[in-house]
UniProtKB/Swiss-Prot annotation:
It comes from Streptococcus thermophilus (strain ATCC BAA-250 / LMG 18311). The gene is leuS. Gene3D superfamilies: HUPs (3.40.50.620), Isoleucyl-tRNA Synthetase, Domain 1 (1.10.730.10), Valyl/Leucyl/Isoleucyl-tRNA synthetase, editing domain (3.90.740.10). It is found in: Cytoplasm. ATP binds at residue 613. Its EC number is 6.1.1.4. Belongs to the class-I aminoacyl-tRNA synthetase family. One of its GO terms (cellular component) is cytosol. Keywords: Aminoacyl-tRNA synthetase, ATP-binding, Cytoplasm, Ligase, Nucleotide-binding, Protein biosynthesis. A motif ('HIGH' region) lies at residues 41-52. This is Leucine--tRNA ligase. A motif ('KMSKS' region) lies at residues 610-614. It catalyses: tRNA(Leu) + L-leucine + ATP = L-leucyl-tRNA(Leu) + AMP + diphosphate. GO terms for molecular function: aminoacyl-tRNA deacylase activity; ATP binding; leucine-tRNA ligase activity.
Length: 833
């Protein structure tokens, strides 16, 4: 029995595509364009896992489909290659992160090519290539010139033992560092910030124009966090000091019975009484040891210390105590809140814990039992009594503005982007600090500012990056003799990924980021596929940079990615014991269809879970390609279920996909292919062309494959296969299983030409119409026969056909026909006696 020999066929066609540059981006200006983009990977030492190809296969299917439909297709791939893991590896092994990264990229590229993806490798980019990051640095200098890149003192997660600050993501819940388990303290340090907040309103409003999953748009809206309210000024009793509170509910001001400042607030030391000084200092120290996440955890016990000072509530002149508490962050809002315990759960818990007064100002609950957080008419609120929320807010804001105690204010949860890292393996920030106190950007003519090669990439220990150790690189002298130091911080990994989709459009341009005409031709990206874990940060940062470049006149569109699709996760098989603990697969044995712990003998429950090294359930695509072939992997991952669903990996499913491809191979190579069409497959063939075309457009690849299976089943029942239908079917399967399709195309055409640019098949709508229909024949009300007849026969013709049927003749033989009722396309009812 013949089968699809993937080990021979797949490398053969991969070599053909590479030798012929089959997937070079089309430049015919008369054709429409299609830009299919994958989120480019970080080339880790572990290589690809089977989750990567799911999204890559989806964009590859669309790219191959669009080429066949006559589009110029831009389908590129590159490497997001700066980042912490390579630096960590280099520090642990003494190797150069550049060498390690190059090896990883070579491995990733080998794996990607083995899967038959139709990338245009002439456009490959690498964020660590100076020719690439020259333009990352150029964008930074433009941000700096426009005042959107600035330096500020910001609290960072400082690890003394590592001699560096670490990102929030690298702090464990217990407040220690992920690497080494060292204590992490919050300490203010000079950092570069990007003023993303200047774009908050546009980033919010323009989401409405995008074809993105609503859930992702909502995550961005929440992250930007626009809220309308008021800034209210509180004076500190007995001093000339005051502080501002932002509140979305200024109408509840009569219920404010205390205020809370962040421990880091500028005023704290100035207003703390001598009696409270020690307690306040201790509390500030404890707060500095916690991450923002730990501090704002709603479930945690409320802690705080009174400063000994009082604020004056501007609406009623009452003296209310000023506390500090770590749930208020200096970086959020104004770093101060007014507490209305009757109507806010966190304030209520705090008031109960510390015996502070609770004053009801909205009617409807029992505020001694719990905070009432619904709306109701105002009470105990002087001139606001009886008003609803909207009326009361409008009235109090007008009153505050008239009296000079506050004003209406729109705020955003979005913070400016902390853009510097005290690391070696990143883009150098192109700024020079001069001894006269000024700073300047490195001029464009001197870019790229190349990252110097060094063996010593350990942190400097001073809070600066390892670049501070490199005196020759670090110190510069101007023409007028003024000395300066280069900026030692490097950019975060997000920098290179915020604009890479633009460089693919014109990757070898040495004069500018990309040519304007080419940007006009290709933007926006038509489809961007990647994981939902990048829903906020990467996509928000890329949108910010794109809008900035739009303002500069560099790009012609307001948004970078017109359509976004998040593929689901491919889960591994895992096992749980009676406690619910996960058990590694190498500790499991299968007996009689059940699963048992090798050591304890306990029966285990099988359940899908995220693939991980510790569970030993990671599936390597190399192994799948070796055993089943790349086309099998592609078809299986698309047939598992909807592309956006998370589904468990199944060896049985993989085998099923392989068997299907073997059936396809046999159908085309073993069936007699003929030049005459007997019409037997007209309907199913045209249905298949129509369905597969429509389902690919909708990215419903699983249903497209199901329809291809329907055609194979129907074709196998026929003695012969019409050549045009055989060719059309091979074209339909080509985006899914391209190696097999190329081989079968040669079997059918012997042209020696790739199938890639052969025009996509079309369908004949008239062939989809049923030309025959089943009708029932009833005699004395009982069904006696079912007949296939031509569609739309008249009553007379239908009656004639029914009475001529042998079965019907036998039933009515010797009986008198009283009447015949014929209903076209439905039934014939014969009344006899």
């Amino acid at each position: 029995m013949s089968f699809y020999n993937h080990k021979e066929i797949e490398p053969k066609w991969q070599k053909y595509w590479a030798d012929h540059h089959t997937f070079k981006t089309g430049t015919d200006a008369s054709k429409p364009k299609f830009y299919a983009l994958d989120m480019f990977p970080y080339p880790s030492g572990a290589g690809l896992h089977v989750g990567h190809p799911e999204g890559y296969t989806a964009t590859d299917i669309l790219s191959r489909f669009k080429r066949a439909q006559g589009y110029n297709v831009l389908h590129p791939m590159g490497w997001d290659a700066f980042g912490l893991p390579a630096e960590q590896y280099a520090m642990d092994t003494g190797n150069d992160p550049a060498d390690f990264t190059a090896e990883n990229i070579a491995n990733f590229k080998r794996q990607i090519n083995a899967l038959g993806f139709s990338y245009d490798w002439d456009r490959e980019i690498n964020t660590t290539d100076p020719n690439y990051y020259k333009w990352t640095q150029w964008i930074f200098t433009k941000l700096y010139e426009k005042g959107l890149a600035y330096e500020a003192e910001v609290p960072v997660n400082w690890v003394e033992e590592l001699g560096t600050a670490i990102a929030n993501e690298e702090v464990l819940p217990d407040g220690t560092s992920e690497r080494g388990g060292y204590p992490v303290v919050r300490k203010p340090m000079r950092q570069w910030m990007l003023k993303i907040t200047a774009y908050a309103e546009r980033l919010l409003n323009d989401l409405d124009e995008l074809d993105w999953p609503e859930s992702i748009k909502d995550m961005q809206r929440n992250w930007i966090g626009k809220s309308t309210g008021a800034n209210v000024t509180f004076k500190v009793k007995g001093t000339d000091k005051e502080f501002t509170v932002f509140t979305t509910r200024p109408d509840t001001l009569f219920g404010a019975t205390f205020t809370v400042l962040a421990p880091e607030h500028d005023l704290v030391d100035a207003i703390t009484s001598p009696e409270q000084a020690e307690a306040v200092a201790n509390y500030k120290h404890q707060a500095s040891l916690k991450s923002d996440l730990a501090r704002t955890d709603l479930a945690k016990e409320k802690t705080g210390v009174w400063t000994g000072a009082y604020a004056i509530n501007p609406v009623n002149g009452r003296e209310i105590p000023i506390w500090i508490a770590d749930y208020v962050l200096a970086s959020y809002g104004t770093g101060a809140v007014m507490a209305v315990p009757a109507h806010d759960e966190r304030d209520w818990e705090f008031a109960k814990q510390f015996g502070l007064p609770i004053v009801e100002v909205l009617e409807g609950g029992n505020v001694e039992e719990a905070a009432y957080t619904e709306d109701g008419p105002h009470v105990n609120s002087d001139f606001l009594n009886g008003l609803n929320k909207e009326e009361a807010i409008a009235k109090i804001v007008a009153w505050l503005e008239e009296k000079g105690f506050g004003q209406e204010k729109i705020t955003y949860r979005l913070r400016d982007w902390l853009f510097s890292r005290q690391r070696y393996w990143g883009e150098p920030i192109p700024i020079i600090h001069w001894e006269d106190g000024t700073s300047t950007a490195v001029p464009e003519s001197e870019l790229p500012l190349v990252l110097p090669v060094t063996k010593d990439i350990r942190p400097s220990g001073t809070g600066e990056s390892p670049l501070a150790n490199l005196t020759d690189w670090l110190e510069v002298t101007r023409e007028d003799g003024v000395k300066g130091r280069r900026e030692t911080n490097t950019m975060p990994q997000w920098a290179g990924s915020s604009w890479y989709y633009l460089r693919y459009i014109d990757p070898h341009n040495t004069e500018k980021l990309a040519d304007e005409d080419l940007l006009k031709q290709w933007l926006p990206v038509d489809i961007y596929v990647g994981g939902a874990e990048h829903a906020v940060l990467h996509l928000l940062y890329a949108r910010f940079w794109h809008k900035f470049l739009y303002d500069l006149g560099v790009v012609p569109t307001k948004e970078p990615f017109q359509k976004l699709f998040n593929q689901g996760m491919i889960l591994g098989t895992s096992y749980r014991d009676h406690r619910g603990a996960l058990v590694a697969t190498d500790k499991v044995e299968k007996r009689d269809g059940s699963f048992f712990h090798v050591e304890t003998g306990e029966e285990l429950e099988q359940a899908p879970a995220k693939m991980s090294k510790s569970l030993k359930n990671v599936v390597n695509p190399d192994d799948v390609v070796e055993q089943y072939g790349a086309d099998t992997l592609r078809v299986y991952e698309m047939f598992m279920g909807p592309l956006d669903a998370s589904i468990a990996w199944s060896e049985e499913g993989l085998e099923g996909s392989r068997k299907f491809l073997d059936r396809v191979y046999r159908l085309i190579t073993s069936k007699e292919i003929v030049a005459e069409n007997n019409g037997g497959l007209d309907k199913v063939y045209n249905e298949t062309v129509k369905s597969v075309t429509e389902q690919i457009e909708l990215m419903k690849f699983n249903t497209a494959i199901a329809q291809l299976m329907v055609f194979v089943n129907a074709a196998n029942k026929e003695d012969k296969l019409y050549v045009d239908y055989a060719k059309g079917f091979v074209q339909l399967i080509a985006p899914f299983a391209p190696h097999l399709a190329e081989e079968l195309w040669q079997t059918l055409t012997a042209t020696g030409e790739s199938i890639s640019y052969v025009a996509w098949p079309t369908w004949d709508e008239s062939k989809l119409v049923e030309d025959e229909i089943e009708i029932v024949v009833q005699i004395k009300g009982k069904v006696r026969a079912k007949l296939m007849v031509a569609k739309d026969l008249s009553r007379e013709e239908l009656q004639e056909v029914a009475l001529a049927d042998e079965k019907v003749k036998a039933e009515i033989d010797g009986k008198e026909i009283v009447k015949v009722i014929a209903v076209p396309n439905k039934l014939v009812n014969i009344v006899v006696k």
